[in-house]
Regions:
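Conserved NTP-donor binding/palm subdomain of two-metal-ion nucleotidyltransferases/polymerases, i.e.
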Residues: 1-121, 127-306, 315, 321-413
């Protein structure tokens, strides 16, 4: 696919996603449905397009459209089955009086206009340290079989459904960030008395993270994947949907402090810029105080006064790169500067290149061992170091820690 065709395809994909999620008007006629569907599937967002009232394609592509439409019922059925498993686990953990929270995936799907259209992955559940071993027994009693473990989680499977029991929220690389995140979870999850935060799935209240910690998790999750093997649009849409849904309930002081301690404030700004510019979310859902940069007053003032409907992401990047992918951009009273816009655009380009996370270089990484991981590390550091410098500086330490963990695990098996 040529660069021009790719640009056109992603302009159309973003327009259709904004229509499916936010009700914006979308194009009536789709010139190249095959290319659009291919990219939507690479990004794991094709299911969201089922929400569109109508798609009009040329005569030659109608068989492909009908074939794709035939996938709607299987997708909804798969998500219903996934929800049933989530509720089954929640009931079992509640009966055992365990402290746990549902992470990412199905908890994000619950805030979509049509939750059954989001393509599901694994079921991720965080367990407080004092309940981790008991939770493993609960899973095994339900017929789940242990598959493997990492520094982050232990993985169980049953009839094609994968459950990851997390002993940590997210594998941060920078040692101080690891420490701060562990302290946050201990204070705000592990030792809390009566739990107050739930999402309703199939009529059952399933515990989830407090809103500010949920935002921290999703920000860190995207950052980790984006700075390693890559990130797809599904996770980026999740982030925007969660901020749009829970933005008014965020404890902004706690969020600001957590992002600062984990060195994620800049990446939060990048995701905010991405969400507004490309996904069409309204800026008022985000904590604008986190986006203000004291060393960029003039840039902030300039962008904050530009509310022209014709403004787009391309206006915030150098003129030599004016072919930027178009934005929705009808709500640009938004204090980010050209550096944030450039990084948001680089995140978009990276997502387009790699597709849904781990597609880029995944086989090379699995088969190449330390050399492969080192090559990917230096490649990403060269391109994306300024997204989150501390994480890149911490990766060698984390790789060594993971290698020692694997050696220790092998000695005991």
């Amino acid at each position: 696919m040529s660069k021009a065709d790719q640009t056109s395809t992603y302009d159309l994909l973003f327009s259709l996603l904004r229509s499916a999620l936010l009700g914006e008007t979308c194009p009536v006629e789709i010139d190249n449905f095959a290319a659009l569907l291919h990219e939507a599937q690479r990004q794991a967002v094709d299911g969201l397009l089922y929400a569109l009232p109508q798609l009009s394609v040329c005569e030659e592509e109608r068989p492909l459209l009908k074939q794709w439409i035939g996938g709607l019922l299987p997708l909804e059925m798969a998500n219903r089955q996934m929800n049933q498993v989530v509720v089954e686990l929640a009931r079992a953990f509640d009966a055992a009086h365990l402290r746990y929270v549902l992470l990412k995936g199905q908890s994000c799907a619950a805030v979509y206009p049509r939750p059954l259209l989001r393509r599901a992955g694994d079921i991720d559940i965080y367990l407080a340290p004092q309940h981790f071993e008991e939770a493993k027994c609960v899973l095994q009693n339900l017929g789940f079989v242990f598959d493997h473990q990492t520094l982050l989680h232990e993985v169980f499977e049953r009839k094609g459904v994968t459950v990851e029991l997390h002993r940590a929220l997210q594998p941060m690389q920078w040692p101080p960030a690891v420490k701060h995140l562990k302290q946050m979870m201990h204070k705000e999850v592990d030792t809390v008395g009566e739990w107050q935060h739930f999402v309703e799935i199939d009529g059952y209240n399933v515990p989830i993270l407090p809103p500010h910690l949920n935002v921290v998790l999703l920000t860190a999750h995207i950052m980790v994947h984006a700075t390693h093997l890559g990130i797809g649009l599904r996770q980026l849409v999740d982030w925007g949907m969660v901020l749009t849904t829970y933005g008014h309930r965020l404890d902004r002081a706690l969020l600001k402090n957590a992002l600062s301690q984990l060195h994620l404030t800049r990446f939060y700004r990048i995701l905010s810029a991405f969400s507004v510019e490309y996904l069409g979310f309204s800026a008022h859902h985000f904590d604008l105080s986190l986006l203000e940069k004291t060393n960029s007053t003039s840039a902030i003032a300039a962008s904050a006064t530009d509310s022209s409907p014709s403004s787009s992401a391309s206006s915030l990047v150098p003129s030599s790169d004016s072919s930027a992918y178009s934005s929705s951009s009808s709500n640009l009273k938004y204090p980010y500067d050209s550096f944030d816009a450039l990084r948001a655009k680089s995140l978009l380009k990276w997502s387009i290149k790699v597709g849904n996370h781990a597609m880029f270089g995944s086989s090379f990484s699995r088969n190449g061992g330390f050399l492969a991981h080192s090559c990917i590390y230096f490649y990403n550091m060269l391109l994306h170091f300024w997204w989150v410098p501390t994480e890149f500086l911490g990766i060698p330490w984390y790789m060594l820690r993971r290698a020692l963990y694997r050696l220790s695990f092998m000695k005991h098996t």
